[in-house]
């Protein structure tokens, strides 16, 4: 698959996973996934399949609606047997349940909202095509989502984080053994994430040919497959250049297109980068639970503070809806709150 882009490889993998999950679905349900194919990604359809599988298993195993039936046996007319109370019970069930592997699964408000959205889309599809007479799933209100504070690295934490990545401060003896082989690569990855706000999937999907050092730019494939050109500063350029110099010394990687590779000489995975961020950030700020997405938030926050232009931030981060950006980055900053607290005095 080396001749394919990372984005295309992921489409192939997710499509294969989707087809495997759909083997246990009722025949009529396949129409839904075919119907939404042109306006959703393979990953979105796969997540829909996972969420709908949970719903169907609950309906067959936890209710009296379909006694003696398996999920595979359901027919489109069975969708009309659901009442609003069934959907409400399902939402309650999602709070905590045991899956087929005996693992306890819990869902907060966001997990419930995502799973309900999948069910509502499913019922809406068949109602619009007049295959069912009523769509009661649409009557169920989505869970109220409470705003979450932006978790990010403060400026001093960011400096310490990069120093830790580069020098291995705080690592165990075992970790230092690996670090001497990966520190240049890790420094390039973390500097790139903090210096551009890339998603972790966009970062690991980069190929060497996507870089242009003449103009300090890189070509990124966004969610949905759109390609954009992003620019980086000289600090990011130096970190990338150092990694490419070291990478060039490994003859095994001559035919490997991926920019960032693992110790197994393959494209590094998103999971591997997540573990690296957790390891280094855990030394600097253990209470914040920093993830690659939090590094993205760090960049977005700093960019907004520097530009005060929410549209620039939305464009650079690849947000399709500027309201998403406004929600997260246009709030009053901690620094402004601190200054405001000193503005009112109680005693002269």
Predicted regions and their residues:
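Conserved catalytic core of the tyrosine transesterase superfamily
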Residues: 1-348
């Amino acid at each position: 698959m080396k001749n394919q882009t990372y984005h295309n490889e992921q489409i192939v993998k997710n499509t294969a996973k989707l087809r495997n999950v759909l083997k246990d679905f009722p025949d009529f349900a396949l129409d839904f996934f075919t119907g939404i194919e042109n306006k959703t990604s393979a990953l979105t359809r796969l997540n829909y399949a996972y969420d709908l599988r949970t719903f169907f298993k609950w309906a067959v195993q936890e209710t009296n609606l379909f006694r003696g039936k398996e999920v595979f046996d359901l027919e489109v007319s069975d969708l009309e047997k659901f009442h609003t109370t069934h959907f409400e019970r399902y939402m309650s069930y999602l709070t905590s349940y045991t899956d087929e592997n005996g693992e306890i699964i819990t869902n907060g408000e966001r997990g419930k909202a995502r799973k309900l959205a999948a069910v509502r889309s499913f019922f809406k599809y068949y109602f619009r095509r007049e295959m069912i007479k009523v769509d009661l799933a649409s009557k169920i209100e989505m869970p109220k989502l409470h705003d979450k504070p932006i978790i990010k690295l403060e400026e001093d934490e960011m400096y310490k984080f990069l120093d830790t990545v580069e020098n291995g401060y705080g690592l165990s003896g075992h970790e230092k053994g690996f670090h001497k082989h990966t520190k240049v690569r890790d420094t390039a990855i973390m500097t790139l994430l903090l210096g551009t706000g890339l998603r972790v999937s966009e970062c690991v999907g980069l190929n060497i040919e996507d870089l242009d050092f003449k103009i300090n730019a890189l070509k990124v494939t966004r969610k949905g497959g759109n390609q954009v050109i992003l620019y980086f500063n000289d600090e990011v350029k130096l970190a990338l250049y150092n990694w490419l110099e070291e990478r060039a010394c490994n003859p095994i990687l001559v035919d490997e297109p991926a920019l960032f590779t693992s110790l197994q000489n393959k494209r590094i995975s998103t999971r591997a980068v997540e573990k690296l961020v957790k390891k280094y950030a855990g030394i600097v700020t253990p209470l914040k639970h920093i993830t690659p997405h939090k590094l993205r938030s760090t960049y977005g926050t700093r960019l907004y503070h520097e530009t005060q232009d929410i549209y620039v931030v939305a464009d650079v981060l690849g947000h399709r809806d500027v309201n998403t950006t406004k929600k997260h980055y246009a709030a009053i900053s901690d620094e402004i709150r601190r200054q405001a607290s000193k503005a009112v005095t109680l005693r002269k």
